[in-house]
A protein has these predicted regions:
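Membrane-embedded beta-strand positions in outer-membrane beta-barrel channels/transporters
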Residues: 1, 12-14, 119-121, 213-217
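Conserved small-residue
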Residues: 2-111, 152, 168-176
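Outer-envelope beta-barrel architecture signal
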Residues: 7-13, 116-118, 127-129, 207, ...
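Outer-membrane beta-barrel proteins
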Residues: 7-10, 22-28, 140-146, 156-157, ...
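Membrane-embedded beta-strand positions of outer-membrane beta-barrel proteins
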Residues: 13-15, 133, 235-237
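Transmembrane beta-strands of outer-membrane beta-barrel pores
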Residues: 17-23, 126-128, 137-141, 213, ...
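Repeated loop/turn-to-beta-strand initiation elements of outer-membrane beta-barrel proteins
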Residues: 128-132, 223-224
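Extracytoplasmic gating/loop element in the C-terminal half of outer-membrane beta-barrel translocons
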Residues: 138-234, 238-240
Length: 262
């Protein structure tokens, strides 16, 4: 923290930073099965997932890809679908034995523990006028979002959502809505959730900085308020959560994300 003054002008700053990680040293899961939530040596909140190659731009590209990288789930893979990477070179994309030692083509792609949590307060005052602003945030955090609120089109009409962000889905040349080959989301489909497996390409960067509060006030001179029988009067305007900087999709609030993954 810091505080100083120059004549009638005073100012100050306060910064708080914290960080923590947790590792499980011993857990009754000798096989280190990933079907069980925890295992010895696990860094808490690790996110296991597949590696995203990209969105197939043509049927030919998808056919060539799945010839050597065929997912063990889903069918009718086509242009606009996700291409997953076969990391172990066996020609199939799967979770192997689903253990730490044999996770197939999954790896630890992130961690949802909030890291480098911080708060910054700045304030100043001059001849009865005061100003303060408070920022808070998280310096590093990965987060996996799932379900229709993130993906939009999902397992069926009644399991889907339609926010403006979801319009950025892949569309081919000649589509009535216009082509969108550089889309964020894969093609819209009610055909299951084969494009929505936990994967690197859609892992969210949940780090953020938010202006939690900003306030401007004025304390009336004592000679004014004493005539009304009062000792002090301060008038002020205040605003909360007026600015947030984050890479996470705008559908979600990085400060109020649910429980940690893993």
């Amino acid at each position: 923290s810091w505080r100083d003054s120059i004549g009638d002008f005073s100012y100050g700053a306060k910064f708080v930073l914290s960080d923590d990680q947790q590792v499980i040293t011993n857990y009754p899961n000798d096989s280190k099965s990933l079907d069980i939530a925890h295992y010895s040596g696990k860094k808490l909140n690790s996110i296991w997932g597949y590696t995203t190659v990209g969105i197939a731009q043509s049927q030919e590209e998808m056919d060539a890809h799945i010839a050597n990288n065929r997912p063990s789930w889903g069918s009718n893979w086509s242009a606009g679908d996700i291409m997953y990477a076969d990391l172990n070179g066996d020609g199939v994309v799967n979770s192997g034995a689903n253990t730490v030692d044999n996770p197939g083509d999954r790896t630890i792609i992130g961690n949802s523990t909030p890291r480098y949590k911080f708060g910054l307060t700045l304030d100043a005052a001059w001849k009865g006028i005061d100003f303060s602003v408070f920022f808070q945030g998280v310096g590093k955090r990965d987060y996996w979002l799932s379900g229709p609120y993130f993906w939009g089109a999902s397992g069926g009409m009644w399991q889907s959502a339609g926010f403006k962000q979801h319009w950025d889905f892949w569309r081919p040349e000649g589509d009535p809505l216009g082509a969108n080959l550089n889309a964020y989301y894969p093609r819209a489909s009610f055909d299951g959730t084969k494009n929505q497996y936990v994967q690197s390409g859609y892992l969210q960067n949940a780090a953020y900085i938010r202006m939690k509060n900003i306030q401007l006030g004025y304390t009336l001179p004592k000679q004014w308020v004493s005539k009304a029988g009062m000792s002090s009067v301060r008038v002020y305007v205040s605003g909360d959560n007026l600015l947030t900087i984050s890479d996470i999709t705008g559908i979600f609030d990085p400060e109020t994300l649910g429980g940690a993954w893993g």
